[in-house]
């Protein structure tokens, strides 16, 4: 069973380097390593608490990134990256907020990028996170309802054929609205939805071209959720097999198990486990530090966490949970883990190189070749 494809995703953090240099370097690496796509995040600030974004926990990366919460705007950056885009590489946002941006503006931005890239834009979209909405006055009581309406609005505008369109909606009503940008050669950007809960999975089946969850931790959970997406697609009269089963996953690798275990103990890496719902923690006999019923990454507000709070939370992360949250191990072990997910339906993985945040510069450098070996191995799956 083959056909697995992969892409890279980077955070758009302002650094001491020229704004586009890190992204263009990653794009070049993606091309060399055979990646299908390059993605950027969409955040007003970081998901890493600023209280631990120091050299003590980030190592040399903290010298290049003096302010972890200084994030570039993704669509502006993607427009720049579209110039000189390597052949066949696709560009995507992973993922944009459905509520913080009016869906008409999102539809326009994605359609513009699709024209700039000659049909290689991907619109990744989800509910977003509380940290990028509520502090800025965006209503957050019903994020899933807003998401459903945003997705329906984008599709309605793209399918309007340049005719006036009116549509009732509790969040994004259209009254004689006009959307006249053309698709590229008859095709709109693919919509990839970051869905996890039942309603989001149903919306994915109705509207999306791909499903790209971020916090599904077990392959068995992945296959069950994929069935829900496909069932919703069938109910909507769509071909369920036309929806690409994807996922965003971090990779922690190194020369040997000792290096990997050391990287997994990083406070910054452990913070990713806070984004996992409380029920996943409970399976390992530990209550989520933010409450047994905590929903996960969408409700974290990291900029308010002080150092002691972060360290106390990190100390509670079960080692077994950490190994579910990311692919980890030697290159061969990581490839075997990805293969297991493939056997549960995964066909596309968007990768975060978690080895880059090791506080040890030497360990970060020595993880480069093992990471490249993983990527070469993925092309054979």
Curated annotation (Swiss-Prot):
<keyword id="KW-0444">Lipid biosynthesis</keyword>
<keyword id="KW-0443">Lipid metabolism</keyword>
<dbReference type="GO" id="GO:0005886">
    <property type="term" value="C:plasma membrane"/>
</dbReference>
<dbReference type="InterPro" id="IPR011251">
    <property type="entry name" value="Luciferase-like_dom"/>
</dbReference>
<protein>
    <recommendedName>
        <fullName>Phthiodiolone/phenolphthiodiolone dimycocerosates ketoreductase</fullName>
        <ecNumber>1.2.-.-</ecNumber>
    </recommendedName>
</protein>
<dbReference type="GO" id="GO:0005829">
    <property type="term" value="C:cytosol"/>
</dbReference>
<comment type="function">
    <text>Catalyzes the reduction of the keto moiety of phthiodiolone dimycocerosates (DIM B) and glycosylated phenolphthiodiolone dimycocerosates to form the intermediate compounds phthiotriol and glycosylated phenolphthiotriol dimycocerosates during phthiocerol dimycocerosates (DIM A) and glycosylated phenolphthiocerol dimycocerosates (PGL) biosynthesis.</text>
</comment>
<dbReference type="GO" id="GO:0006629">
    <property type="term" value="P:lipid metabolic process"/>
</dbReference>
<dbReference type="InterPro" id="IPR036661">
    <property type="entry name" value="Luciferase-like_sf"/>
</dbReference>
<dbReference type="GO" id="GO:0016705">
    <property type="term" value="F:oxidoreductase activity, acting on paired donors, with incorporation or reduction of molecular oxygen"/>
</dbReference>
<keyword id="KW-0560">Oxidoreductase</keyword>
<comment type="similarity">
    <text>Belongs to the mer family. Phthiodiolone/phenolphthiodiolone dimycocerosates ketoreductase subfamily.</text>
</comment>
<dbReference type="InterPro" id="IPR050564">
    <property type="entry name" value="F420-G6PD/mer"/>
</dbReference>
<dbReference type="Pfam" id="PF00296">
    <property type="entry name" value="Bac_luciferase"/>
</dbReference>
């Amino acid at each position: 069973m083959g056909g697995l494809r992969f892409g890279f995703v980077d955070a758009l953090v302002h650094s001491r380097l020229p704004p586009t240099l890190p992204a263009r370097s990653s794009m070049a690496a993606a091309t060399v390593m055979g990646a299908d796509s390059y993605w950027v995040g969409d955040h007003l600030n970081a998901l890493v608490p600023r209280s631990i974004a120091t050299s003590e926990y980030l190592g040399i990366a903290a010298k290049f990134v003096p302010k972890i919460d200084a994030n570039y705007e993704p669509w502006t950056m993607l427009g720049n990256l579209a110039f000189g885009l390597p052949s066949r590489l696709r560009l995507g946002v992973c993922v944009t907020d459905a509520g913080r941006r009016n869906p008409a503006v999102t539809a326009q931005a994605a359609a513009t990028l699709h024209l700039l890239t000659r049909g290689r834009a991907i619109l990744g979209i989800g509910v977003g996170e509380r940290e990028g909405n509520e502090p800025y006055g965006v209503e957050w009581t019903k994020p899933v309802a807003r998401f459903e309406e945003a997705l329906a609005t984008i599709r309605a505008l793209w399918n309007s054929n340049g005719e006036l369109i009116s549509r009732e909606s509790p969040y994004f009503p259209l009254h004689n609205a006009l959307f006249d940008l053309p698709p590229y050669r008859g095709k709109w950007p693919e919509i990839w939805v970051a869905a996890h809960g039942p309603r989001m999975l149903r919306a994915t089946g109705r509207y999306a071209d791909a499903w790209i969850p971020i916090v599904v931790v077990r392959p068995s959970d992945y296959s069950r959720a994929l069935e829900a997406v496909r069932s919703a697609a069938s109910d909507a009269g769509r071909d369920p097999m036309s929806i690409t089963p994807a996922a965003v996953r971090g990779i922690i690798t190194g020369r040997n198990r000792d290096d990997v275990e050391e990287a997994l103990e990083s406070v910054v890496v452990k913070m990713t486990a806070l984004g996992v719902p409380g029920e996943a923690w409970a399976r390992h006999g530990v209550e989520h530090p933010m409450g047994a019923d905590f929903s996960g990454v969408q409700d974290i507000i990291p900029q308010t966490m002080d150092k002691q709070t972060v360290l106390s939370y990190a100390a509670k992360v079960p080692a077994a949970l950490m190994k579910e949250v990311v692919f980890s191990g030697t290159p061969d072990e990581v490839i075997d883990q990805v293969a297991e997910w493939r056997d549960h339906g995964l066909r596309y993985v968007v990768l975060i190189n978690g080895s880059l945040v090791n506080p040890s510069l030497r360990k970060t450098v020595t993880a480069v070749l093992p990471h490249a070996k993983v990527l070469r191995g993925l092309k054979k799956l």
